[in-house]
Design a protein with these regions (language model features):
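Residue-level signal for short hydrophobic patches within transmembrane helices
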Residues: 19, 23-42, 46, 68-75, ...
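Helix-loop interface residues and adjacent transmembrane-helix termini in multi-pass membrane transporters
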Residues: 42-45, 53-56, 90-93, 175-176, ...
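Interfacial/gating helices of multi-pass transporter permease domains
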Residues: 51-70, 102, 140-151
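Short membrane-interface helical motifs at transmembrane helix boundaries
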Residues: 116-154, 204
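Membrane-interface helix-loop junctions in multi-pass transport and translocation proteins
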Residues: 190-209
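Small-residue-rich hydrophobic transmembrane alpha-helices
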Residues: 59-122, 163-182
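Single conserved hydrophobic/aromatic residue that forms the stacking wall/gate
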Residues: 1-13
Length: 209
């Protein structure tokens, strides 16, 4: 009777909570995705730290632009995540044509969001950055921060289209259960970003500061 009771509890546990194989598979998929998202957010963190060594105005300008880019990142993430729901279902059913269509939608949606964001940044970049600035001390620091922010925004905009395309491809790969590849790509991106930031911000050897 005790054996039957334990078996019954085990069956309830598996139905309601899941078995070890499920959690192992889940962790193998989820952990690389968690690490990738953390690494992606680490890029702006590194930028703020390194630029902060140059001065308060530079730090303020970069931090403000990173806030704007963060909103853009959320918009792209929402666009590709919505289509990923269908993409995962298509792939699970073996409908590769439907999976291809979902990828196309993600790519077009991400590029559309990017086009809208770039249009706003080009036409209203100064106004958007100015929303974060108030010259309470009246010492001209806000104008300096605004100038640095506008300069930094022009540089960041260069990478928006590659970022959008990368997000579309990365989510498509994740739908197939391959979450390790995007994580490795994120490590490579953060590593190259950190090295280039250090070289271009502080100047090493022939590279000007």
């Amino acid at each position: 009777r005790d054996v039957e009771r334990s078996r019954g509890l085990g069956d309830v546990y598996k139905r309601q909570i899941g078995d070890k194989a499920f959690y192992k598979r889940y962790l193998m998929l989820a952990i690389p995705m968690i690490i990738q998202n953390a690494i992606t957010n680490l890029v702006s963190f590194l930028d703020n730290i390194m630029v902060g060594q140059l001065g308060t105005e530079q730090m303020s300008g970069v931090a403000i632009v990173n806030q704007l880019i963060f909103v853009y990142n959320l918009a792209v993430f929402g666009a590709v995540s919505a289509a990923s729901i269908f993409g995962a279902q298509y792939f699970g059913k073996g409908n590769h044509k439907g999976h291809m269509y979902s990828f196309r939608f993600k790519l077009y949606a991400a590029l559309l969001v990017t086009a809208i964001a770039m249009t706003l940044f080009i036409t209203n970049g100064t106004a958007l950055i100015s929303l974060y600035l108030t010259d309470t001390a009246e010492n001209g620091a806000t104008e300096v921060a605004l100038a640095y922010g506008k300069e930094y925004l022009k540089i960041v905009m260069i990478g928006l289209i590659p970022f959008a395309v990368t997000q579309a491809y990365a989510t498509n790969i994740k739908e197939t259960g391959q979450t390790f590849v995007p994580m490795v790509a994120s490590f490579a991106a953060v590593g190259s970003n950190a090295v280039l930031d250090f070289l271009l911000i502080f100047g090493i050897g022939p590279i000007p500061k």
